[in-house]
Amino acid sequence: ERKSIKGIIARVHLEEFEKGIILPHEFTLSKAKEYRLNLMKATNCNFSQIYALYMDSEHTTLATIDNESKDTPKLEFTDGEGVTHRLWIVTDENVIAKLCADFADRKLYIADGHHRYETALNYRNYCRENGLSKVGDPCDYQMIYLVDMEHPGLVVFPTHRLVRDLPDFNVEKVLDGCREYFDVTEMNGDRKSVV
């Protein structure tokens, strides 16, 4: 079944998590952030947008998006996985002002890109500490794809992670905890067939 989802790619002001405006749902690994920070320092570039969700019970923003995406898109292509991407560019100042007003009091929930977001914060701080930027410069912002949390095309795919080297890790205790909420099936075979 083909799905379709619409959102906004926007320049979003970076906020510390403590402010409760942009919210994470997972912890990050320092090694991945270090790599990304070094890449940003070397290139002064933001290579990949963050994916964030917002709540809009009236779906007013989605109505605006639908209205702005009636004409032929500025760009359309199908990627190697068969996903078609369409991009419309909004230049009408009134529409932009309306969209900005829509988000004035909204929280954003990071769906994908926790490492990138934290790296963007670290990069902004690095630039300020080293006199490379001031408040309002580009490093105060991050490219984020914003999607209505109740969009009918929203699909959340599973993420499979391998956990290892945890101190005092007890596999049976973890599996017992999982059995409270899930059906747990033991798989036999070599590691490659299971992972």
Predicted region positions:
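Surface-exposed, charge/polar-rich loops and edge strands
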Residues: E1-V195
